[in-house]
Amino acid sequence: MANFFKDNKDLCFTLNNIDLEEVVRLREENYEFAKEFDNAPADFADALDNYNRVLSVVGEISGDRIEPRSRTVDAEGPHFADGVVTYHPLTVQNLKDLTDAGVMGVMLDHKFGGLNFPVTVYTMMTEMVSRADASLQNIFGLQDIAETINFFGNDEQKEKYLPGFARGELDGAMDLTEPDYGSDLQSVRLRAWQDENGQWYLNGMKRFITNGCAKVHLVLARSEEGTTDGRGLSMFICEACPQLVVRRIEDKLGIHGVATTELQYNDVPAQLCGRRRMGLIRYVMSLMNGARVAISAQAVGIAEAAYREARKYASERKQFKQTIDQFPAIYSMLSEMKVKLTAARALLYETTRAVDLRNGYNALVEQGKATAEDKAKAKYYDKVAAVLTPMCKALATEVSNQIAYDAIQIHGGTGYMRDFNVERFYRDARITNIYEGTTQLQVVAAIGGVMQRANDARIDEMAALPFEGRMAELRDKLLAMRTRQQEIVQFVTDKKDVAFHDLVARNLVEMETYIFVGFLLLRDSLKSEERFAIAERYILDNELEYNKRFDRIMAADVKLIDNKRDIIDY
């Protein structure tokens, strides 16, 4: 029997070594919930044992049931006729298996029938499901919709929807993109209007809506007449109904198991969720940041699957009387794939930990229970999560695409054929650095935190760990890179040139990532010596890359800004 948790040494290491004690204490309100709910942990050891147990269950479902069904789901997919989407029977069975395991309300409060697990543990589930079938994650992961209602909805909305999500009776969709407005969400035009009784209705179109056949939708709509920017947008809850028409499902390159739909709203009854005018500014940005973490996990899951297929094939395929993994050209590729995969996972769960701490301390603030220290931590983790989330999505999704690409290369011609899984991983990975914000938009989201040095406190904390010998030498290399990073940030700031700033932004974000992830991997090597080779390879490779980019920015070459049309239009 395959178990995608127990067979993943790195994932098990992460759960048992990442510091979640503070996270769980906040999540369980100092374990007071144990007095009221039977499934609430009594202490941290109890919580960790519970996380291990549930992750093992999801790992077994993912490895033993979902993955063997994935080829058929990919080949046949959902069907669409007369405005009705019908999911493949195996997709329906996958969702039933997860529902029966009680993991459809992973992060929801105990009082709504949820598990009240941290984002970090839930993300481990989404990684495993994605490794088994990336398209299923696009349905399973939309339980984030329930979490958004929990954060911003009123008590009546919570009572109406959240228990149904926890029981697996309801599924969700987030309806943001329109035919003319994708990244430019502040310009969406779908109209929300009220009748004389105060009832809201929605009119317009949405496109590229994942699981648009869902029972519950969160919709970004323009509630304020005469507005054209983000301040005129509100968030609404609506339900599947005859007035909400699925016009078609898209014919996609990958993630075939989930329906991506075009929706038409014909006076769809809706409820305002939260406050008017805050739809994009607060609620949808929160929803999208949660989705960006989920897509990062999806990317890591695909990368894990692709790496394993490549490693297995290379260890079995013989050429010139030896297996091809004995050739430097191949084992160097496999090594690079493994280093990048481990790096992406390390950043993913450092990010989710920051998100968990942000959520925990902000909850104290909202409940009026926060001390001055708690309020300071809430502000700190707001800043950290805001920069790590886009950094993480950029890294994980680009790594996933590269690993899927290399997995086909290692397979050679056979990898190009549908007989092998790697061609599906390549197709599925391709969307990850596009939806929920392209890599280019993740750079826009992250660059402010990089310029403001939001990661410096955490870097200082890791740099102070008791490294010795070769580890201390690598730490010093990272610190030297951090000093240069501070120098280059000041250089770009002092130029006061917006075009130059935007031109070098991706380099700056990726340079920051090299440093931060290098420290994460070095930190983990203190807990497991066998991880040291990965940390060393990552730091040495990226030291060279860092210096190359540093020199390029310091050269202040603006020729591309001046002659871009000459090149593009040639």
Language model feature labels by segment:
Residues 59-60, 90-159, 163, 167, ...:
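Internal helix-loop-helix
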Residues 2-5, 10, 17-21, 255, ...:
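Alpha-helix capping/hinge segments and adjacent helical runs
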Residues 199, 203-244:
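A short core secondary-structure module
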Residues 342-393, 489-503, 522-526:
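C-terminal helix-coil-helix/basic helical segment that borders enzyme active sites and/or dimer interfaces
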Residues 1-81, 85:
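Extended, charge-enriched "interface" segments that sit outside catalytic cores
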Residues 453, 465-570:
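C-terminal amphipathic alpha-helical interaction region
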